[in-house]
Amino acid sequence: MNAETCVSYCESPAAAMDAYYSPVSQSREGSSPFRAYPGGDKFSTTFLSAAAKGQGFGDAKSRARYGAGQQDPAAPLESGAGARGSFSKFQPQPPAPQPQPPAPQPHLYLQRGACKTPPDGSLKLQEGGGGHNAALQVPCYAKESSLGEPELPPDSDTVGMDSSYLSVMEAGVKGPQDRASADLPSPMEKADSESNKGKKRRNRTTFTSYQLEELEKVFQKTHYPDVYAREQLAMRTDLTEARVQVWFQNRRAKWRKRERFGQMQQVRTHFSTAYELPLLTRAENYAQIQNPSWIGNNGAASPVPACVVPCDPVPACMSPHAHPPGSGASGVTDFLSVSGAGSHVGQTHMGSLFGAAGLSPGLNGYELNGEPDRKTSSIAALRMKAKEHSAAISWAT
């Protein structure tokens, strides 16, 4: 070896192996596998820093031949741990990827117009009159969104769509509209439905006198005739069985209504007979009795009504009788006594009211002289008059 040149050994064996297998160092003509440096540069700072990084001056010179955008051919042969074939622990950051230049825009550009389906169903390119740089109007076949933009994927090629795909899309767009139109009835169908409703309405059946007579005869026998009886009646009256059945239903409803009304009238008649008619009879047929024999010790005449106590159970109250003028207390005795024991009860009551001294002789000396047949007939006559009166009131209302 020359004195001017010395062999430089790297500090780490990995760096030496890298330098041995490096194609850059082997590409020089007649160079040894070891890296040689001038003697003056052996102990310089450049040599030490290069040795520490695991590379020599030759690497920097050889890598300067490649451009900034070209790749070093030695990079694929080196390890992937280091960016430039270095096994050192000081691994530099990988270079940032360079942005790709934008692709040149073509002169012809596509414009998507309004999203309308052409009538012929084929794709047409409408070329404007602008020459080479004219725009192509490409209609879309997708469903328009609420903002007016057709809902197509951004990378779909509208020009490349074939007719089959377009026909499928067109059918998909028209399908919901056709279904919606099929669900809604047309005006003609509405008119037909209204006419059908009018036809279902049936006219009111009018019965003749003969038909009503036959129906009433059967109704007097039974209110619920069976199917056989209804069919026989329909044959006799020239009606349908359904009409006969409906007539019986209406007739039963009318009968029930009359029954309820009759019960209400009976209740009303009962109350009027029990409470109103006896009061009217008393006021019309009876008057107050003034008897001079009822004069007491003070000498004042006191008018006594005919009925002092309730007179409904007592027949004598409702039938006045003529008595001889000598018997002063005969009317009061007839009213208060029905049997022999009744006279004693009447004496007790009247004695308590007017004093026992003036009433005792007359009551004790009076003998009953009743007429039961006349009383019974008068009660029956009054009851008949009451029934006639209630019937007249019910028919008037």
Curated annotation (Swiss-Prot):
Its main location: nucleus. Gene3D superfamilies: Homeodomain-like (1.10.10.60). Belongs to the paired homeobox family. It comes from the Eukaryota. PROSITE patterns: HOMEOBOX_1, HOMEOBOX_2, OAR. PANTHER family: HOMEOBOX PROTEIN ARISTALESS, HOMEOBOX PROTEIN ARISTALESS-LIKE 4. Residues 92-105 have a biased composition (Pro residues). GO terms for biological process: regulation of transcription by RNA polymerase II. Keywords: Activator, Developmental protein, DNA-binding, Homeobox, Nucleus, Phosphoprotein, Transcription, Transcription regulation. It comes from Bos taurus. Pfam families: Homeodomain, OAR. A motif (OAR) lies at residues 377-390. GO terms for cellular component: nucleus. SUPFAM superfamilies: Homeodomain-like. Residues 59-131, 175-204 are annotated as: Disordered. InterPro entries: HD (IPR001356), Homeobox_CS (IPR017970), Homeodomain-like_sf (IPR009057), OAR_dom (IPR003654), Paired_Homeobox_TFs (IPR050649). The keyword Nucleus applies. It is found in: Nucleus. Binds DNA. SMART domains: HOX. GO terms for molecular function: DNA-binding transcription activator activity, RNA polymerase II-specific; RNA polymerase II transcription regulatory region sequence-specific DNA binding. This is Homeobox protein aristaless-like 4. Residues 200-259 bind DNA.
